[in-house]
Every structure is written in structure tokens, then in C-alpha cells.
Amino acid sequence: MTMIVGRHIIAELYGVSPELISREENVRCIVDGVVDEVGLNKVGSVYKQFNPHGVTGIVLISESHVSIHTWPEYELVNLDIFTCGDPQKAEKAFKLFIERFKPKSYRHYILDRG
């Protein structure tokens, strides 16, 4: 029997407003806000602003991590949400990211890790 220890959601969001995902401040505000709203336990974070635009960020949570990579020139966001413990928190975080980034379309994969 395989024991499931976490839920991992990998997502690609298409048609996201470049203004929303070009600058670190905007991306950080959205990601940190979702982590807080879902009730994940933030340990720390690192964000990198690319020139002329685009952001990579990772939030270390005691349950695992949330990472993001943005390509404003392609209106693209890649998300990685991995939580050990309550699998509903990963799903809630994903739904909030969809609400905040408002992609025209997306695809995602849900993996039960164990």
C-alpha cells in the first residue's frame, strides 16, 4: 500500500496580463497573499526580478513549497504548489491563484505524492 504524504499541483497559466506579472512587487504580493490566506506556514521566500521583466520566486513553507516563474512577453505563469498535510490547502491555493492571475486558460496536473 502506498502512503500519500502530499499533494503537488503543477500548473501553466496562459493569457495572464503582462502588467500583473512583470514586476516582483506584484508577484510577491499575490503569492504571499495566497500563502497567508490558505494558512500555509511560511518559513521564508526569495524572489528574483529579471530585466527587462519577469519574476521567479519560491516560498518555503513548513509543509513544502510554492514556486512561480513568469514570462510577461508570453503572458505565461508557471506554478508549483506542493503541500504535505492537508491536501485541500494545495487545491485552495490553486483556486486563489486562478482568481488573482485571471488567466484566459490554464492546464494543471495534480499528483498525490507518496
Protein language model features and the residues they cover:
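Polybasic/polar functional segments that serve as interface/processing modules
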Residues: 1-114
